[in-house]
Amino acid sequence: MKYRDLRDFIQLLEQRGQLKRIKQEIDPYLEMTEIADRTLRAQGPALLFENPKGSRYPVLANLFGTPQRVAWGMGQEDVSALRDVGEWMAMLKEPEPPKGLRDLFDKLPLFKQILNMPVKRLSKAPCQDIILTGDDVDLNQLPVQHCWPGDVAPLVTWGLTITKGPYKKRQNLGIYRQQLLAKNKLIMRWLDHRGGAIDFREWQEAHPGEPFPVVVAIGADPATILGAVTPVPDTLSEYAFAGLLRQSRTEVVKALSCDLDVPASAEIVLEGYLMPGETAPEGPYGDHTGYYNEVDDFSVFTITHMTMRKDAIYHSTYTGRPPDEPAMLGVALNEVFVPLVRKQFPEIVDFYLPPEGCSYRMAVVTIKKRYPGHAKRVMMGVWSFLRQFMYTKFVIVCDEDVNARDWNDVIWAITTRMDPARDTTLIEHTPIDYLDFASPVAGLGSKMGLDATNKWPGETQREWGTPIHMDEAVKRRVDELWDSLGIFD
């Protein structure tokens, strides 16, 4: 499936009964959040608020409110096919030459799709149909959501922030929330380890005191949006990965104020700069944890140009206690992660990030255990494998007979195969989510690994229990009798 732009995707969702147009006047202040939250919790459609109070621009919400819509956005027909996306990423992360002629032919479709990875630069693009500069730049024209009663100000949530460091060829795309500060200013909340923050830090080292160019694109095509939230290898541009997902090259156009590339079909584009040393207090905001976060200082993004398509659509979301849209993205991206971790650790059977755990704070891993201490090795591997997993506070490792996605199975394994003192691994002073107020220091906390596997000689001195299983012949006999017994008639 190919979507040239966000509007193509909206049309597809509408055809499939997965988009609802809301014609009543709805206030971006709290009302949109309440409607979107109720809809998402009922596994409802994406929402297009056509008459937002105080603005002429419609608001698109709940776009990726189900894992199925995430799969469609990635060009796949169903969620299970996202494993194929993970296979592509595993190959791109650690490419291997074909092992023979058969392997070469098997990989030809992927090699063909790799041809779509270079961007296609345009001289003109719809995202620059309307150009506003200077005093004409006014973010108050946009229906920016004020999501929760305790939020300090409206918040731009789905902006794709585009940056480039002084030492890299590739441009980085990331999604960072941005507090509305003034008609032409936002606060850029990015954490130190994120790509945009790294680019800014390196820029300040190379160009002390000089403004750092930044572009924020709102309402890009789904492949580009999802490319920005997928853990692509550091050497690969999100634009290139979006081309792989879309099966056609990502179309970009040069920004008006700098050399950064802008998604050609984006609905709204904000161009400007960060001035080193210019910061402002950000927050509090309700976040994906289900709590309001602390106030902290972050850099101010000054906007010099605002460009947009004719009849632009403002793309927005909210975050709150799961399930929310980030949690649904997490469920879908979980399927992408499985082939990635399996390539590094072939003994892994399944890898699950429960959405109740704020998408990444807890992982359940099932393995084909081969030796004493194997579970602990897997714990350490998970925490160190992808940058995203350094925020995972709890890793539970179980045997392959346990369904990682069934809490009945997992809790049974924890309570029958674990000794709390022997099988719990605690690690202090590790990187942790800055939004995790439970940690003793912001950004620094502990991790817990739970070894819920059967214990091998060397891990226990006792005879280990044998699981109960019914005789197979008896089960077959009862299967034959079952309907005639009439127990549930």
Swiss-Prot record:
Pfam families to which the protein is assigned, alphabetical: UbiD, UbiD_C, UbiD_N
Binding sites annotated in the UniProt record for prenylated FMN: 175-177, 189-191, 194-195
Keywords of this entry: Cell membrane, Decarboxylase, Flavoprotein, FMN, Lyase, Manganese, Membrane, Metal-binding, Ubiquinone biosynthesis
Catalytic activity: a 4-hydroxy-3-(all-trans-polyprenyl)benzoate + H(+) = a 2-(all-trans-polyprenyl)phenol + CO2
The enzyme's E.C. designation: 4.1.1.98
Pathway: Cofactor biosynthesis; ubiquinone biosynthesis
Active site: 287 (proton donor)
Entry note: cofactor: Binds 1 prenylated FMN per subunit.
Bilayer disposition of the protein: Peripheral membrane protein
MF annotations from Gene Ontology: 3-octaprenyl-4-hydroxybenzoate carboxy-lyase activity; metal ion binding
Primary location: membrane
Keyword Zinc: no
GO biological process, one term: ubiquinone biosynthetic process
Cofactor(s) needed by this chain: prenylated FMN; Mn(2+)
Compartments where located: Cell membrane
GO cellular component: cytosol; plasma membrane
Binding site for Mn(2+): 172, 238
Quaternary structure and interacting proteins, as annotated: Homohexamer.
Role description: Catalyzes the decarboxylation of 3-octaprenyl-4-hydroxy benzoate to 2-octaprenylphenol, an intermediate step in ubiquinone biosynthesis.
UniProt xrefs under NCBIfam families: PRK10922.1 (NF008175), UbiD family decarboxylase (TIGR00148)
Protein family membership: Belongs to the UbiD family.
Record's protein name: 3-octaprenyl-4-hydroxybenzoate carboxy-lyase
Organism annotation: Tolumonas auensis (strain DSM 9187 / NBRC 110442 / TA 4)
